[in-house]
Amino acid sequence: MACVKGSNAEKTNAIIMAAGLGTRMAPLTKTTPKPLISVNGTPMIETVINALVTAGVERISVVVGYLKEQFCYLEERYPAVVLVENTEYLEKNNISSIYAAVDVLEQGATFICEADLVISDEHIFQPRPSRSCYFGRKFSGHTGDWVFDLDDSGKIVRIGKGGSDTYAMVGLSYFSAPDAKRLARFMHDAYKETGHEQLFWDDVVNNHIAELDLSIHPVEAQQIAELDSVAELAAFDHGYVYLLRS
């Protein structure tokens, strides 16, 4: 695609995964990629980009696939943004989006972010984490969603679905330069394996969890929201309530 630029090494990087179909947000996603759906006046992905820019991130690689042309305006609006195309988004899970931007990991410390988030606190990435981490929200009770198990020192020892009274994944993470380079190597290795097509990128992290130094960076519910359905969107932005009546 013409609007996708080449890559240059930068000091601090970010990868935003924006290639997916967003089928649970239909009918809106039939014509608009989920990250570009406006929530209270701002496209979701722009709340993520704004927070990264506020934190001084120099290069933000937005990995696109579905309706990719609609993201081109971001390169004009944000000098730090570079679009990277994921040509495998229909055939493979989101491991393919990280692999499409694996060169970013090889260049240094990197934030990895989902694109379909609403970040209300533009300072969520400040101060910059001092070590590799997943941002997580503490919860009570049991959930079947993605969670983290921690050891007594606070190090993450498992990433997976299902857990009780721990931290839930919110779609943001940070890898120090050494860990980012390790993750790049793990991604290359995973891509050689049969069945990698079904993997989430977090599965690769979990498979090598002992080789990475990952902790939790706690966040509060009012700082960030992940909207997975039209009902959740309508609860967050009442301008979409009409969709619940159709």
From Swiss-Prot:
Mg(2+) 2 binds at residues 145, 226, 228. Keywords: Magnesium, Metal-binding, Nucleotidyltransferase, Transferase. Its EC number is 2.7.7.107. The keyword Signal does not apply. Pathway: Phosphorus metabolism; phosphonate biosynthesis. It is an enzyme of class 2 (transferase). It catalyses: (2-aminoethyl)phosphonate + CTP = CMP-(2-aminoethyl)phosphonate + diphosphate. The keyword Thylakoid does not apply. CMP-(2-aminoethyl)phosphonate binds at residues 19-20, 34, 97, 114-115, 145, 161, 202. This is 2-aminoethylphosphonate cytidylyltransferase. The gene is pntC.
